[in-house]
Amino acid sequence: MNNQEAINALQMVRQANPLVHNITNVVVTNFTANGLLALGASPVMAYAKEEVADMAKIAGALVLNIGTLNPTEVEAMIIAGKAANEAGVPVIFDPVGAGATPYRTETARNIASAVQLSVIRGNAAEIANTIGESWTIKGVDAGEGSGDVVSLAKKAAKQLKTVVAITGKEDVVTDGNTTYIIRNGHPLLTKVTGTGCLLTSVIGAFAAVERDVLKAAAAALVIYGVAAEIAAKNAGDEGPGSFQIAFLDALSRVGADEISRYGRIEQGE
């Protein structure tokens, strides 16, 4: 995986305009939809259990996010996930806040067990708690933990039989055998709610067009991080509000030149 492959994947997203079915949380719905539109994908937010299976089957990817979970939506997620599995549609899962409460942790584990995931993306604490490893979490944000994030990602990939993306100061993405480290992004991403959730949906957009889901996830992480760096530069010292707008603009404009110059991806051990 290299910058040119990330560029190629971005071009495929923009040419195909893939439909990404999101069952996500109420905090981030608008930002997620606008971010996908800016990137070049086509978002749909369909939550009713009476239609989620039909929608998932016609989508390019299904994204499940438990940020504001409730029993009705969890049921819809599992229905949609199983329908996507039957149709060969990639399923991307964001176990927001896994480890914060027993119900949230149990829900993350149940979804990961009931649905064959293509990619799971979260911070180290969320991924660790989803697979039963010990890691502290603060609300729905990453807490303090000790341990090797690469080893954690590989263990999760093998246990869940999926690609795992652990995001933080450095991003790690692995299928348990091949691992990539991405060193792009900007601290202002942590000052705007929903940037992690949007990233998960962006991975969905790439997985819809690049069937090698490891490469799809890696490409999404590189491009997302480069866009954040561009946005921070353009926003200057204005703060997170201006950054949020600049970031949507950057997602729509980022291209081959910026990715070639600023993309920082390397293969790990």
UniProtKB/Swiss-Prot annotation:
Its cofactor is Mg(2+). GO terms for biological process: thiamine biosynthetic process; thiamine diphosphate biosynthetic process. This is Hydroxyethylthiazole kinase. The keyword Nucleus does not apply. Pathway: Cofactor biosynthesis; thiamine diphosphate biosynthesis; 4-methyl-5-(2-phosphoethyl)-thiazole from 5-(2-hydroxyethyl)-4-methylthiazole: step 1/1. It catalyses: 5-(2-hydroxyethyl)-4-methylthiazole + ATP = 4-methyl-5-(2-phosphooxyethyl)-thiazole + ADP + H(+). GO terms for molecular function: ATP binding; hydroxyethylthiazole kinase activity; magnesium ion binding. ATP binds at R121, T167. It comes from Geobacillus sp. (strain WCH70). NCBIfam families: PRK09355.1 (NF006830), thiM (TIGR00694). HAMAP family: Thz_kinase (MF_00228). The gene is thiM. Substrate binds at M45, G194. Catalyzes the phosphorylation of the hydroxyl group of 4-methyl-5-beta-hydroxyethylthiazole (THZ). Belongs to the Thz kinase family. Its EC number is 2.7.1.50. InterPro entries: Hyethyz_kinase (IPR000417), Ribokinase-like (IPR029056). Keywords: ATP-binding, Kinase, Magnesium, Metal-binding, Nucleotide-binding, Thiamine biosynthesis, Transferase.
